[in-house]
């Protein structure tokens, strides 16, 4: 009788451990998938911004590319809503609605507003990614990772805010004081990039990043001031990629420490 009770008790304990382990694995898998999907949405939005910017700037549509990006974004956002927990679905639906509105209305925007609207949605996604990551770190009680991640996150968001101001100032270059305003934001941007270099040196030393930093430096020092508006937007696009790659580096380190390495992004660039 004692042996039977001991056996049943052991089975119950093992079943409980298995249940908890299975539940924890499901929680890990859901957070991992949410971050992966949000990361893909950011990447696709960046590509959509570049494609629509080209269309608005030069009045030429690459309709096949735009259709492919629309389909990919629509699919990713649907998966995002489906993957999220019931109580979190509304905030992902808000993102889905906002992106859908942009996909329908971007061709009514000016070049500057198109840049700003895409930037808002990209930051929206990054804040959602931050929320998932912070919650994951809290559940796992990884205070060591949390503190480092939070510090890096602040530097990255400060850099994004500076980049937004730099982008906005491009449209005002021909106005009184516009050139000095752009130079001021360019100087601040270079300082922010130096801070990011401590976080992810490889992101800052990429060819596109190095070229853009050099161009900004030449503009600030006055040795290269004959850049067109299109060229300046190109510089800010390269810097946007640099900042995104820096955050991707930070996020990848955290997620790999908690669960698994993040997959390679499906689109290059």
Model-predicted segments: where are they?
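Hydrophobic alpha-helical segments
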Residues: 1-269
């Amino acid at each position: 009788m004692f042996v039977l009770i001991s056996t049943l008790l052991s089975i119950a304990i093992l079943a409980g451990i298995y249940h908890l382990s299975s539940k924890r694995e499901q929680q890990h898998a859901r957070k991992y998938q949410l971050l992966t999907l949000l990361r893909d949405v950011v990447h696709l939005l960046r590509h959509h911004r570049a494609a629509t910017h080209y269309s608005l700037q030069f009045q030429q549509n690459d309709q096949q590319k735009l259709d492919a990006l629309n389909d990919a974004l629509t699919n990713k956002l649907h998966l995002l809503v489906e993957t999220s927990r019931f109580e979190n679905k509304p905030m992902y639906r808000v993102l889905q609605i906002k992106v859908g509105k942009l996909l329908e209305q971007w061709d009514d925007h000016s070049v500057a507003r198109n840049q700003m609207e895409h930037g808002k949605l990209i930051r929206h996604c990054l804040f959602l990614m931050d929320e998932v990551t912070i919650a994951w770190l809290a559940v796992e009680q990884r205070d060591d990772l949390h503190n480092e991640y939070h510090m890096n996150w602040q530097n990255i968001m400060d850099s994004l805010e500076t980049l937004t101001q730099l982008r906005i100032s491009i449209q005002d270059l021909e106005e009184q004081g516009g050139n000095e305003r752009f130079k001021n934001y360019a100087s601040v941007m270079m300082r922010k990039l130096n801070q990011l270099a401590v976080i992810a040196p490889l992101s800052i030393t990429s060819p596109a990043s190095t070229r853009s930093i050099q161009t900004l430096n030449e503009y600030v020092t006055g040795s290269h001031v004959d850049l067109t508006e299109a060229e300046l937007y190109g510089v800010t696009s390269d810097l946007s990629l640099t900042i995104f790659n820096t955050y991707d580096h930070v996020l990848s380190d955290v997620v790999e420490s908690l669960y698994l390495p993040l997959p390679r992004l499906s689109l290059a660039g």
